[in-house]
């Protein structure tokens, strides 16, 4: 995937504590988003930064940091910023699109998304674990 990311890095004073130095030999993560106005936000690595109006691009050493910033963008700002995307950069210059994988956030309903672990019954219809204890069946398959 030969995709180039565009956007300006938010303005912040400080450093990443050397985290991105190791990301040059391992992997790093980038988050991109579009803001309708210039506003201050908290960095998951500590400190604060000012996002630009328009496209923004920020690199992190860990996926959790990018996901934390994405959650903050969706919940703390008016209007909510839901147009963010997270990418993974591998050392060999390969780029992989990471989140949201199929274009819809995991907690939203998406037509065609398959169910994971769905059992067609109510909680009251679950079997009593004592009745299946020594049968060799697992409670989640009974």
UniProtKB/Swiss-Prot annotation:
Report the protein's function.
PsaD can form complexes with ferredoxin and ferredoxin-oxidoreductase in photosystem I (PS I) reaction center.
The record's Gene Ontology cellular component field reads: photosystem I reaction center
Species of provenance: Synechococcus sp. (strain ATCC 27144 / PCC 6301 / SAUG 1402/1) (Anacystis nidulans)
Lineage, broadest ranks: Bacteria, Bacillati, Cyanobacteriota, Cyanophyceae, Synechococcales
Annotated segments matching region Disordered: 119-142
Q: Which residues cross the membrane?
A: none
Q: Which Pfam families match?
A: PsaD
Q: Which domain of life is it from?
A: Bacteria
List the InterPro entries hit by this protein, alphabetically: PsaD, PsaD_sf
Supply the name of the protein. Answer: Photosystem I reaction center subunit II
Q: Which UniProt keywords apply?
A: Photosynthesis, Photosystem I
UniProt family annotation:
Belongs to the PsaD family.
Q: Which GO terms describe its biological process?
A: photosynthesis
């Amino acid at each position: 995937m030969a995709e180039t990311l565009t956007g300006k890095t938010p303005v912040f004073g400080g450093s990443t504590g050397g985290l991105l130095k190791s990301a040059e030999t391992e992997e790093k993560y980038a988050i991109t988003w579009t803001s309708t106005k210039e506003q201050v936000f908290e960095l998951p690595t500590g400190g604060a930064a000012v996002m630009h109006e328009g496209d923004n691009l920020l690199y992190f050493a860990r996926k959790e940091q990018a996901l934390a910033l994405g959650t903050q963008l969706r919940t703390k700002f008016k209007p909510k910023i839901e147009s963010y995307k997270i990418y993974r950069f591998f050392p060999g210059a390969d780029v992989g699109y990471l989140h949201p994988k199929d274009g819809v956030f995991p907690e939203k309903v998406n037509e065609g998304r398959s169910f994971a672990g769905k059992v067609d019954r109510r909680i009251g219809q679950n079997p009593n674990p004592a009745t299946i204890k020594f049968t060799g069946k697992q409670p989640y398959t009974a």
